[in-house]
Amino acid sequence: MTNKKELKDVQVKGKKVLVRVDFNVPMKDGQVTDDNRIIAALPTIKYLIAQEAKVILFSHLGKVKTADDLEKRDMAPVAKVLEQKLGQPVKFINAFEGKQLEEAINEMHNKEVILFQNTRFADIINSNGQISVDSEGKAAAKRESKNDSALGKYWASLGDVFVNDAFGTAHRAHASNVGIAENITESCLGFLVEKEVKMLSQCVDNPVKPFVAIIGGAKVSDKIGVIEHLLTKADKILIGGGMAYTFFAAQGHKIGNSLLEVDKVEIAKTFLAKGQGKIILPIDALEAPEFADVPAKVTTGFDIDDGYMGLDIGPKTIELFKKELADAKTVTWNGPMGVFEFKNYSIGTKAVCEAIAELKGAFTLIGGGDSAAAAIQLGYKDKFTHISTGGGASLEYMEGKPLPGIEAVQSK
């Protein structure tokens, strides 16, 4: 997947460059509350300006399910933040198709930047410009999310070159990534996506051994594909979080009132048989009588007491996991070890985060989501080789699945 055309392989001077960015940022009362994704896109945008391109940016913002979302998911506030971060004007076009957008693009000069309206407005507005909803008032047009061929061709017709710099949607085949890439003469990856692909590839496809994967989070069902694929790649897989109790149940241990996916016990048994010696489970836990931030009780072994639930890995497990990590040269971590939101049950996640951060000479990658939030919150952001920006996309890459948004881009 790393043989894709990159931004520096393409001549962009004077060209209209369509850039699919990921500006799907959190909003509150019409204000952007976290601008990290906007900042992450700046290197690609600044490079295109320096190369004297005409820069046409677009992104989705949240899900557009009802007509009310047209107001809530407006990109105008994002344009203002981008303008501040970029230090030059960003012209916002309140349209995602039509004459207003076409005229604005045709009037552009080199080095100018425009951002057009939320691509997912095309999920509720049909090709006649009418709001299209079903009997329940839910979006029915679905032109963006179902990769409508006419919309992909239309957007492609607005530019000369397409740059996909939105890793967060790389696992989706939408009109604004796959649709454009398939209908334009030249396409490439932006700097952000290029880095993500290189880092994930280095971790999963060509790891320096020993390769240790740490998988946590609440559910086995969310990580089945990841565990399956990593069993063929990793030397060890350390399992924590709520999902560990389904594995314990598969081994016949008592799990009290802990989280259990009954329908996944057989899969857990299969993994344990396949991954003999590879899968390392916790050897103790922190348990509580309720799902609350109450003082923890440490179990003496695998079994959870009746009337209790396991909410974090225990001290012996922390030492075991540290020992398993000590010689690792490649580490990927995806999912917390316990209920990280509860102070009493955030100890395991913090300890694992610290243990990875302190490894010398290892390639360390966090697969986005809660683990990334934990590392950033603990101040370890710069101690990891890479923290992925795409939760779902990085998970699917770790499952060994092709990512449509990247596959559609031209090869070198």
UniProtKB/Swiss-Prot annotation:
PANTHER family reported for this sequence: PHOSPHOGLYCERATE KINASE, PHOSPHOGLYCERATE KINASE 1, CHLOROPLASTIC-RELATED
Disulfide bond positions: none
Entries under InterPro entries matching the protein: Phosphoglycerate_kinase, Phosphoglycerate_kinase_CS, Phosphoglycerate_kinase_N, Phosphoglycerate_kinase_sf
Single GO MF annotation: actin binding
Catalytic function, reaction form: (2R)-3-phosphoglycerate + ATP = (2R)-3-phospho-glyceroyl phosphate + ADP
Example of a GO cellular component annotation carried by this entry: actin filament
Keyword Cytoplasm: yes
HAMAP family on file: Phosphoglyc_kinase
Enzyme class, first EC level, given as a word: transferase
Biochemical pathway: Carbohydrate degradation; glycolysis; pyruvate from D-glyceraldehyde 3-phosphate: step 2/5
Designated name of the protein: Phosphoglycerate kinase
